[in-house]
A protein has these predicted regions:
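Short beta-strand segments at enzyme active-site cores
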Residues: 46-50, 83-86, 117-122, 152-153, ...
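Active-site beta-loop-alpha junctions enriched in small/polar residues
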Residues: 21-23, 52, 87-91, 123-126, ...
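Short, acidic/polar
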Residues: 28-39, 97-112, 161-166
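Active-site mouth loops of central-metabolism enzymes
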Residues: 20-30, 88-100, 129
């Protein structure tokens, strides 16, 4: 697929941002390398990770996903071809957005990734215990130093995002170029009713996570059947009449396009105002094949899905 520009950056990326949260969690190093290789074979170049991935797994301490990515890029010698996004704030040993923490955390991530720069560095969540001026000043220093090319926000409200951007404008700091928030066909209110207007007004990129509703919008969850997945418990909220109606419509549209249910769900998301590249992860090469070619939907198909889920 053709690479697309990310607003307010010089970056051009694949329409699907590959989620790295599974690397070192449900996908070991060998599986992760296979998925990454397959993604690049499809011209993929945009990979999302975080220092906290996957601290929650027994035996892990954080930087597990970053470490796998670093080894893979070193082995392939392709760092210059890959757009890497990582995050700071949620790792237990590097929590929050103080200037001191950000300065230390970026060096930890650079070491794990075996690189001397990060393409997009996110504030993983808002930290209201630290003044935005301090956080943004620290991020600006990283951009000026060359350790980070662009900065972005994740899990910010529209109000806080607008405030952060305004501070950066006044102070002459680097500005957030993207927002990564929870958004999919089944969960629209939080983003559309809050942050989306700010994203659109400021001309930055929305890069939504959980675009497949923790896997529910792949169609693998069927009524009365149990799915063996580390994410199965997280889809319970979608296993209802509305959820299955949406999957049924996705299935019908997918048949028309000769593609997968997941591809259609991501196609709807990619077509929403402000959205640049949805994020989705794959534990296996087979799962990657279901998501890597995002469907291009007609206006009527987009409207039908929107009407069903509004």
């Amino acid at each position: 697929m053709t690479h697309i520009p990310l607003n307010k950056t010089d970056l051009k990326v694949h329409p699907l941002c590959l989620g790295g949260n599974v690397f070192g969690w449900s996908a070991d190093e060998t599986q992760s390398f296979a998925v990454l290789n397959a993604y690049t074979e499809h011209n993929g170049n945009f990979i999302d990770t975080a220092d906290v991935y996957s601290e929650w797994k027994d035996g892990n301490t954080g930087h597990d996903s970053e470490t796998i990515l670093g080894k893979w890029m070193k082995q392939r010698g392709n760092r210059s071809e890959i757009v890497i996004a990582t995050k700071v704030a949620k790792l237990s040993t590097r929590a929050g957005l103080s200037a001191t923490n950000i300065t230390a955390a970026v060096d930890d991530s650079l070491r794990a990734l075996q690189t001397d720069y990060i393409d997009i560095y996110y504030a993983h969540e808002d930290d209201k215990t630290v003044p935005l001026l301090e956080t943004l000043g620290a991020f600006d220093a990283l951009v000026k130093s060359g350790k980070v090319r662009h900065i972005a926000a994740s899990n910010y409200t529209g109000e806080r995002l607008a405030e952060a951007i305004e501070i950066s404008k006044v102070e002459g700091f680097a500005q957030y170029v993207a927002l990564q928030n929870h958004y999919n066909l089944l969960e629209r209110k939080e983003f559309e009713g809050d942050a989306a207007p700010v994203v659109i007004q400021e001309g930055i990129s929305a890069i939504p996570y959980f675009g497949l509703a923790r896997g529910f919008l792949t169609g693998k969850y069927r009524q009365g059947e149990t799915v063996n997945s580390v994410r199965a418990a997280g889809v319970a909220a979608y296993e209802n009449e509305r959820g299955y109606q949406v999957v049924s419509l996705l299935h019908d549209i997918a048949k028309t396009h000769n593609t997968t249910i997941a591809s259609v769900a991501l196609g709807w998301l990619a077509a929403q105002p402000g959205v640049s590249t949805p994020i989705a992860s794959a534990r296996t090469v087979e799962q990657l094949q279901e998501i890597v070619n995002i469907a291009s939907l007609s206006a009527d198909e987009i409207a039908e899905l929107s009407d069903l889920t509004k």
